[in-house]
Amino acid sequence: MAEGEDGTWWRSWLQQSYSSVRDKSAEALEFMKRDLTEFTRVVQHDTACTIAATASVVKDKLVVEGSSGTTDKVKKGLSNFLGVISDTFAPSPDKTIDCDVITLMATPSGTTELYDSTKARLYSLQSDPATYCNEPDGSPAEFDAWLAYWDPEHRKAEISELLVTSPSIRALYTKMVPAAVSHSEFWQRYFYKVHQLEQEEARRDALKQRADQSVHSEEPQWEEEEEDFVGAASAPNFKLEEKYVISPPTIPTLHVEDKSEKMAELNRDHTSITSPSESSESISPITQIANPEYIEQTATKESSPRPLTVKEKNGAGTDESSAHAPVEQITGKSNAQIGTHREDPPSDLRVFELNSDSGKSTPSNNGQKGSSTDVSEDWEKDFDMTEEEVQMALSRVEVSGEVDDEDWENWE
């Protein structure tokens, strides 16, 4: 009993499973058949529409003259094929390509004309549905101000011409009015877009004219600036030539007014008085230059010693007599001697040249040649003078007759 019941249960389960699988498979098969049928119908419909559209385009665009023969048939088939390709890839007549390289563009009427950026933007604006559906760009206040002067009665003729000549405007007007927008809104938005386009073109033209005027106005200014620069550059050359004319050299006159230099001269005279032998052979450069005869005498004195002359003896005698003279008279005479040397500018110039020469040899106190001494020692030797040497030098000048008595009286 139990085994029979188990067998019937398994049999019934298998039958139920088989029936459920069969039902599900039938349903899936029905779905597949229905999908395939629908897909086939859609493909057939699309193919038929494409063939019909291609045939209509070829019929409208290509006109083949009636002829006979195989060549004409080949030409006809080739022209049909090329017409389909051109219609597939070419834009519609109311569309334009805004590109500066293209020199021809299609008009809404189906013809071509020379490319113009303004007209190209206008044709693109006419074929754009956003021109009529969306609100105008810019501030609403400007749009309201423009609407205050908007009068549709004055635009009736222009509206009629646009509907006749522009297929894109006519198609959009048919679709949108009155389903999407009203008649007044359609034309208000269109003409306001045209107004904005005209304003933009006017601004571009003004900027272009301003740029051209600036270029034309700057060119002559550059030429004038170049001429001014050339003139300004040439004028200083003549001034420089006149300015830097070399003048003949002039020997400046040196005026010794410093008290230190006066004291140096006094000290030099004092040293010549204390040592007569030294002053006789090594006299200051001023005395050597002022007395050219003495230069010739010193040349002979250096070669051989000489005895004292009568003038020198007289000078020694006068030194003893004049030793008791007041100091003021001595200083006055020394100043007079300095004044006589000041009146001779060339001698002063030579004195400075001789004193500045530091490397030359000067005769020593004993009359020997070739003993080089330092500049500082020479100055000390010149400054180391006593009153006797000063009196000796003054008496020598009086005997030689270089200074007149009238000059001495004037100096005193």
Curated annotation (Swiss-Prot):
Residues 208-219, 255-271, 340-351 have a biased composition (Basic and acidic residues). Gene3D superfamilies: BSD domain (1.10.3970.10). Disulfide bonds: none annotated. Residues 272-287 have a biased composition (Low complexity). Residues 146-198 form the BSD domain. Residues 355-374 have a biased composition (Polar residues). Residues 208-228, 255-383 are annotated as: Disordered. This is BSD domain-containing protein 1. It comes from Xenopus tropicalis. The lineage of its organism: Eukaryota, Metazoa, Chordata, Craniata, Vertebrata. The gene is bsdc1.
